[in-house]
Design a protein with these regions (language model features):
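ABC ATP-binding cassette signature C-motif
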Residues: 1-255, 305, 309-514
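Intracellular alpha-helical coupling/juxtamembrane segments of multi-pass membrane proteins
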Residues: 243-276, 280-286, 290-297
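Phosphate-sensing "switch" segment of ASCE/P-loop ATPases
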Residues: 301
Length: 514
């Protein structure tokens, strides 16, 4: 298989250059993790590579692209909603897949008058040795929790639609998989299965993920997008962390030297008369270039969050013999739990077992079927749910936060302006006046999280907070939660995040909470 070569790829969206003259090579059987702060163009790069979006210029930057059949897992699947799950998953034009689809349809709607046709299909499957593929189809569907194959995809939840698209991509006749956040809406066991499946698939993979264990286990190389450029690192995520730290040390040392030189040149500039000789112009030009480099700072922004919180009393949250049922299905039964001020509770379990229900009962958006949830009088809850609520996308970024506060008081007593806070949280000044609707999905979640924290909560409820957040933001969030004065309850499938944040685990298993 030829290498997929990309040379001097440039892409602009409106007046923003997303990436400029980036070049890289994708080798056969590579598994490349694509990382970068939200808004740097990770999804845009996958769009361009897949052909969903175009590139700048008239000359193609791609070599040997036609050797690759690309399967693309997007964040928002575009399906024919009238088609069934079976027809959607098995949409490949591969003969074996077509036979499997026909076989499954006959088995779903079996009658005696279809027996002869069924036998004919089975004989063809025998001749093409398609039963191994059929077994793989069954395994993929089972592992992803896709059961009712006759349901129209238009009737599925967002999470199930994503799993259907993931199955479609995994089972398609592709040799290059572009996967945008493949672990979203998957539980831990399914993520572990997916890791092994991709490792054994003999396919080339380029993927975006916030799940650092998944990234570490799967990747053989890391591509990092930053400030319209792309940097490559050999190895997995742990290798990237080590190599990046070494590079940051070199960058810091170089910046220090430039700052010292800038001070010397600034003193020289101040000593010179306004009408400078032409022969000095080259030195003057170098001074202005140096000024730009020094004012740009180091490559990585040091993100910090240290917000003042409201006081919390001894009584926080208590579940007293709480039961809850949904459509006659018991979710909680005589459940008791005392949440104390310093608790860091991770909530885990399969999809649909009631993890989010627990948070909704605390938030008051659901009422128990029996028992009661007692909330302390001083409790002030911030609920970071999977669906962003109350985010008026017609507003401008800085105005959205200034409606809550003009400045932020930290736990140390100092104050920070909203503009400075936005910069610390990776919103450059150029974005402060932008409409929220122009932000990426991850940037919107980051902005929403900032708003919640500005409201000075003393209890945090987090429902899958790592979805759509970049790794840099997750690191800051983890550090913030470790220093947060009140209790934190978080539903998450992100094992790395839970290991860093949670000191207790509530596990939904076999209809019980352990």
């Amino acid at each position: 298989m030829s290498d997929f070569i990309v040379e001097k790829l440039t892409k602009s969206v409106g007046d923003k250059t997303v990436f400029k003259d980036i070049s890289f090579i994708i080798h056969d059987l590579d598994r490349i993790g694509l990382i970068g702060v939200n808004g740097t163009g990770k999804t845009t790069l996958l769009d361009v590579l897949s052909g969903v979006s175009g590139f700048d210029g008239d000359v193609s930057p791609f070599s040997a692209k036609n050797d690759y059949q690309i399967g693309y897992l997007t964040q928002d699947p575009d399906f024919d909603d009238s088609k069934t799950v079976l027809d959607t998953v098995l949409s490949s034009d591969l003969k074996e897949i077509q036979l499997i689809r026909e076989y499954e349809l006959l088995m779903l709607n079996y009658s005696e008058d279809k027996q002869a046709r069924l036998e004919r299909v089975m004989a063809e499957m025998d001749s093409l040795q398609a039963w191994e593929i059929e077994s793989q189809v069954k395994t993929v569907l089972s592992k992803l929790g896709i059961q009712d194959l006759s349901t129209p995809v238009g009737e599925l939840s967002g999470g199930l639609r994503r799993r259907v698209q993931l199955a479609q991509v995994l089972l398609g006749n592709h040799n290059l998989l572009l996967l945008d956040e493949p672990t979203n809406h998957l539980d831990i066991a399914t993520i572990e299965w997916l890791t092994l499946f991709l490792k054994n698939s003999k396919k080339t993979v380029l993927f975006i993920t916030h799940d650092r264990y998944f990234l570490d286990a799967l990747s053989t190389r890391i591509f990092e997008l930053d400030r319209a450029g792309l940097t490559e690192y050999q190895g997995n995520y742990q290798d990237y962390v080590r190599l990046k730290a070494e590079q940051d040390e070199r960058d810091a040392a170089l910046l220090h030297k430039k700052e010292q030189l800038y001070k010397q040149e600034l003193a020289w500039m101040r000593r010179q008369p306004q009408a400078r000789a032409t022969k000095q112009q080259a030195r003057i030009n170098r001074f202005h270039d140096l000024k730009k480099e020094v004012s740009g700072g180091v490559a990585e922004t040091d993100l910090t969050m240290n917000f003042e919180t409201s006081r919390i009393g001894k009584k926080v949250i208590e579940f007293q013999d709480v039961s809850f049922a949904y459509e006659n299905k018991p979710i909680l039964q005589d459940f008791n739990l005392l949440v104390q001020a310093k608790d860091r509770i991770g909530i885990v379990g399969d999809n649909g077992v009631g993890k989010s229900t627990l948070l909704n009962l605390i938030a008051g958006s659901l009422e128990p079927t029996a028992g009661q949830v007692v909330i302390g009088e001083t409790v002030r809850i911030a609920y970071f749910s999977q669906q962003i609520e109350g985010l008026d996308e017609s507003k401008r970024v800085i105005n959205y936060l200034q409606e809550v506060a003009e400045e932020v008081k930290t736990s140390g007593g100092s104050t920070t302006s909203i503009a400075e806070l936005l910069e610390q949280f990776l919103f450059p000044r150029s974005t402060h006046g932008a409409l929220i609707e122009k932000l990426s999905g991850g940037e919107k979640k980051r902005l929403y999280l900032l708003k919640l924290l500005l409201e000075k909560p003393n209890v945090l409820l987090l429902d899958e907070p790592t979805n759509d957040l970049d790794i840099a933001t997750l690191t800051v969030l983890e550090n913030f939660l470790q220093g947060f004065a009140g209790p934190v309850l978080t539903v998450s499938h992100d094992r790395y995040f839970l290991d860093k944040v949670a000191t207790k685990i509530l596990a939904f298993e076999d209809g019980k909470i352990r």
